[in-house]
């Protein structure tokens, strides 16, 4: 994405009033669905809903994609992008590990 970050910035941060203005929301909604499905496979459907609410799941996923998006826009090099992406992923994965193993 780094080589196309100008397009990504337009898509995510500057698409108000276009058919793409809800792109990030769509991406987060897709992540919500796949994460909930994974939790259902791990814990069973009933327990998955007790592990984390849909609202909390959405907020955490939105924070993750927002952090990645900010990183794409602000990174000064591919190396910086990769290093910061690693930090973001490690941070969020540590939290998700708790919910995968409850």
Q: Regions from the language model: what does each represent?
A:
Residues 1-12:
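Helical hydrophobic small-molecule/effector-binding pocket
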Residues 24-28, 81, 98:
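General N-terminal targeting signals
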Residues 3, 17-44, 55-62:
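Amphipathic alpha-helical packing segments from all-alpha helical-bundle domains
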Residues 25-28, 32, 85-93:
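Hydrophobic core segments within long, regular secondary-structure runs in both alpha-
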